[in-house]
Amino acid sequence: DMEITDETVIYESKILDSHPLKYYIIHKPSGYVCANKDPHDPCLITLLPDDNLHYVGRLDRDTTGLVILTNDLKLRKRLTLPEFHIPRTYAFTCLNPLKDITSFKEGITIDGDVKCLPAIVEMTSEYEGVITLEEGRYHEIKKMFLSLNNKITSLHRIMYGDISLGDLE
């Protein structure tokens, strides 16, 4: 008689395999990449004691902030798939004053024909603000700003769902 759970495999009342679920929240510094191997840049995963982990939402090399790593593939799927509507929140600085935030609410078209899901932007100054979105396409925020003839100069993820950086530095 065999029993298999997310954490263990039990056969004839003996534990054959045990994989405790692990969760890490890390404050990604600039210059690191969210990859397991990279020939040019240091990988964020090398800062952790366990390399059998998966990224929950990658960040670009120059983007800083909250990254989650786990071996819990069910959680990873739930946090990353768009149908679960998990918000990601970023603080940003842009090159030019951002005057048109209504375009974000309507969904901005990037790469010529890809319409992004609506995003919420709150400005804290002419050049700085916070953006919240529910998907994580490749360079999505940077491309949204480029489509408005602007450029992101600093991007920092502060929340992923209900998880925040807190006091992590």
For each predicted feature, which ranges?
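Basic, flexible Lys/Arg- and Gly-enriched helix-loop patches that mediate nucleic-acid binding at interfaces
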Residues: 1-169
